[in-house]
Amino acid sequence: MVKAKIAVNGYGTIGKRVADAVRAQDDMEVIGISKTKPNYEAAVAHQIGYDIYAPAANLEAFEKAGMPAAGTIEEMVEKADLVVDCTPGGIGEKNKPMYEKAGVKAIWQGGEDHSLAGFSFNAICNYEQAVGRDLVRVVSCNTTALCRAIYPIDKELGVKKARVVLARRATDPNDVKKGPINAIVPDPIKLPSHHGPDVKSVLPQINITSAALKIPTTLMHVHTVNMEVEKDCTVDDVKNIFGSQPRIRFVGQGMSSTAEIMEFARDMKRPRNDMWENCIWPESITVGDKELYFFQAVHQESIVVPENVDAIRAMMEFESDGAKSIEKTNKAIGLSKK
């Protein structure tokens, strides 16, 4: 089997997870990852066998640190069929000319604007439209979770309007530079938050509004979701719809917080405690007068990872059926709802 040669530009929270997920597939391989500095993440990448590429000005620093770089980032890009850009928001836009010059396909993350790629991706919603594309943006963690939940409800019941309040984790567990530590921050104060409009970049037919708060935690986001639907339904109808989705998990069995969900991921021996699925509390699902409500938790560090793998497979035209790609990706990384 010919494998797609994938470069991961940016080996941070998302990049290192994407690299490992790509490595787990049988139809793609990681030809290199990029780091700007020879820090602990670069050291681990070197230890587990990734070829590291760095800015030309920093090659000597990597050499002195005992992890010689395989070349420059530009050289890595030249060797790739497709680059997954996992650099911080705003940096990816600056990298676009480099990808265009090399003639490679590129994926960006949700921190970049929709206009950068002209197409925003979610595997369950619009996989088939990504087949053969050269440029794709995988939407953010929150938008990914909302698309996964809204799309099947719209398909089965018709969504007249969605309203979402997001309690967002302040920062990732390894980030000591951000906060808040002892505050709740409306983010933004002016409504709506960007999440509703971002959902519309994938599902333009959905009438949605959103508001968000930053809270002093690092584990997960939590969404309070309300949808007005076209058809009468019951709680069991909604549970059956969500239960049929390959990347939605019900969290019951005494899990009443994000802390317990993360402990559950540890107990399942998930890599890095990752929870790639939407985590919906089934007892929160409430239905009445053609409206439904529920809570869901979102692991911001990992939920977009399988989406990136599916985007690669679509863009490389290895699989035209989104459901088959999702199944293949899930199996390879160990995403099982059992």
Curated annotation (Swiss-Prot):
BP GO terms, sorted: glycolytic process; lysine biosynthetic process via diaminopimelate
Superkingdom in the source lineage: Archaea
Record pathway: Carbohydrate degradation; glycolysis; pyruvate from D-glyceraldehyde 3-phosphate: step 1/5
Keyword annotations: Cytoplasm, Glycolysis, NAD, NADP, Oxidoreductase
Catalytic site positions: 141
Catalytic activity, reaction form: D-glyceraldehyde 3-phosphate + phosphate + NADP(+) = (2R)-3-phospho-glyceroyl phosphate + NADPH + H(+); D-glyceraldehyde 3-phosphate + phosphate + NAD(+) = (2R)-3-phospho-glyceroyl phosphate + NADH + H(+)
Compartment(s) of residence: Cytoplasm
CDD domains: GAPDH_II_C, GAPDH_II_N
Gene3D superfamilies according to UniProt: Dihydrodipicolinate Reductase, domain 2 (3.30.360.10), NAD(P)-binding Rossmann-like Domain (3.40.50.720)
Binding site for NAD(+): 13-14, 111, 169, 300
Subunit structure of this chain's protein: Homotetramer.
Protein's recorded name: Glyceraldehyde-3-phosphate dehydrogenase 1
Organism classification: Archaea, Methanobacteriati, Methanobacteriota, Stenosarchaea group, Methanomicrobia
